[in-house]
Amino acid sequence: ADVGAWIIAGKEAKMGVVTDIKQALRAANILRVMYNGTDERMVMRMLPPRSASSPGVNVVADVLAVVPGSAAGEDSSTVRSEIRVRERNVFLVLLNGNGKMMVGTADALELIDPRELTSRVGAFVRNVSDDPGLAEKVVTEFDLPGGGKMEYPVSQGIVSLQTASDTPFDSYLDVQNRIAQAFDDIRTHLAQRQFGKPYVELSDAQRQVVMRAVPLKISEAEPHVSR
């Protein structure tokens, strides 16, 4: 059976405590988790199982579902896979206990206002100018419902999120939602271009095409201890 758990935390909760709960769930092989904060926003994710993966660019990519005020969302078929990723395809998001955020690639991190995060993630993932410092793309052919084909440059980009042990849980949820919004925006653009209507109005078959063309990939490192 697919067993899940809820993590409901108040305004004072810190990511160090949440991580302890996640580790206990992983030890019990309960990997599907719904996070619920103080503002009724929810994020569903699959926890990576404990593994002795090597350091560097080995990451676990989890497809998240952002569920606004509901226990079910359009992306509820969450997917987890362990993959090896080139460094240029990893967009780092570092969030400390004071809410300060640094983003970018490993050799080009910069401090930003969290309100800029959605646009920064979107620019990295889409890489419309084919910048070699941003995410790679692989042109992929998809079968369309009702017949026909679609070619789309699928981004290889992954967002890697790291918090501190004293990062507020609400800040973590806010960042997760801002990251997911970037992918939602790209999906909406593709849906409008390919099917002539917003993503939320697509049929299930059309939505599956868009989700495969624009996969939502986020990896997480365990929170580090703030100094």
Task: List the predicted regions and their residue ranges.
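Long, low-hydrophobicity, acidic/polar, solvent-exposed interaction domains
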Residues: 1-227
